[in-house]
């Protein structure tokens, strides 16, 4: 896979809390220029991103995060945020699981949290962020299987806000355990070589704020 070919697998991401409208507009322009898969932002920017991409007749998708970055919001709050994101034009929803529910064995509430977001998302594809850095291998597999059971399209490894991001071994683990769910690797992927390794391990999407560096052969500086 060539550098430019990998662009179509990249969610071009800006999730810093200090991001300005000018920053988001630049992100959108870059996504259009390089042909990235999506523009991924906080929900407050969803309508702006939708309007920009539509105005430029771009096939780039609008991706909005829900319950980001900690996933500890009430399920009702996640439902409302998802509803708003879809109403404002999101094509994809990246939701953060409730890690505490999973680690506590509160599996009914854990599943309900995911299922609620998937249901409200309608035709928007849901990527379930399982924050692998906090989980055992058994919990990673359980989270991936639950995401699939609830109708999610993807499992996503990380928010980029935890102590570590994507790991090749986690992608391989999920791919082997749940072969019929797509995987988004995110967190710390800054070079073409890293992105290629994750796609070879089984990732179908790469979440990064270093998309331009990846496709141009440079090295990104962001932690996400």
From Swiss-Prot:
Instruction: Give the superkingdom in one word.
Output: Archaea
Q: Which InterPro entries match?
A: Aldolase_TIM, DeoC, DeoC/FbaB/LacD_aldolase, DeoC_typeI
Purpose of the protein: Catalyzes a reversible aldol reaction between acetaldehyde and D-glyceraldehyde 3-phosphate to generate 2-deoxy-D-ribose 5-phosphate.
Catalytic residues of the enzyme: 94, 156, 184
Instruction: Write down any Gene Ontology CC term.
Output: cytoplasm
The protein here is known as Deoxyribose-phosphate aldolase
What would be an example GO MF term here?
deoxyribose-phosphate aldolase activity
Which Pfam families does UniProt cross-reference here?
Answer: DeoC
> Which pathway does the protein contribute to?
Carbohydrate degradation; 2-deoxy-D-ribose 1-phosphate degradation; D-glyceraldehyde 3-phosphate and acetaldehyde from 2-deoxy-alpha-D-ribose 1-phosphate: step 2/2
Reaction equations catalysed: 2-deoxy-D-ribose 5-phosphate = D-glyceraldehyde 3-phosphate + acetaldehyde
Instruction: Please provide the record's keywords in A-Z order.
Output: Cytoplasm, Lyase, Schiff base
Give the family from UniProt: Belongs to the DeoC/FbaB aldolase family. DeoC type 1 subfamily.
Where is this protein found?
Answer: Cytoplasm
Under PANTHER family, the record lists: DEOXYRIBOSE-PHOSPHATE ALDOLASE
**Biological processes, Gene Ontology terms:** 2-deoxyribose 1-phosphate catabolic process; carbohydrate catabolic process; deoxyribonucleotide catabolic process
Lineage here is:
Archaea, Methanobacteriati, Methanobacteriota, Stenosarchaea group, Methanomicrobia
**Lyase among keywords:** yes
- The EC number(s) given in the record are 4.1.2.4
Keyword Nuclease in the entry? The reply is no
């Amino acid at each position: 896979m060539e550098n430019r070919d990998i662009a179509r697998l990249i969610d071009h991401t800006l999730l810093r809390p200090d991001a300005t409208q000018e920053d988001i507009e630049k992100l959108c322009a870059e996504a259009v220029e390089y042909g990235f898969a999506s523009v991924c932002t906080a929900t407050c920017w969803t309508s702006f991103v939708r309007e920009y991409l539509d105005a430029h007749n771009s096939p780039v998708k609008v991706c909005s995060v829900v319950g980001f970055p900690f996933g500890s919001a009430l399920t009702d709050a996640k439902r409302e945020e998802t509803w708003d994101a879809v109403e404002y034009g999101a094509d994809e929803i990246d939701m953060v699981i409730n890690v505490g529910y999973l680690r506590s064995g509160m599996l009914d509430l854990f599943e309900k949290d995911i299922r609620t977001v998937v249901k409200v998302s309608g035709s928007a594809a849901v990527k379930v962020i399982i924050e692998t850095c906090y989980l055992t291998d058994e919990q990673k597999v359980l989270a991936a299987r639950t995401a699939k059971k609830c109708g999610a399209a993807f499992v996503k490894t990380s928010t980029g806000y935890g102590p570590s991001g994507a790991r090749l071994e986690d992608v391989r683990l999920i791919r082997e355990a749940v072969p019929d769910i797509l995987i988004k690797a995110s967190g710390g992927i800054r070079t073409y070589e890293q992105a290629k390794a994750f796609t070879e391990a089984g990732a179908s999407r790469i979440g990064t704020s270093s998309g331009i560096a990846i496709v141009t052969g440079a090295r990104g500086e962001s932690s996400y």
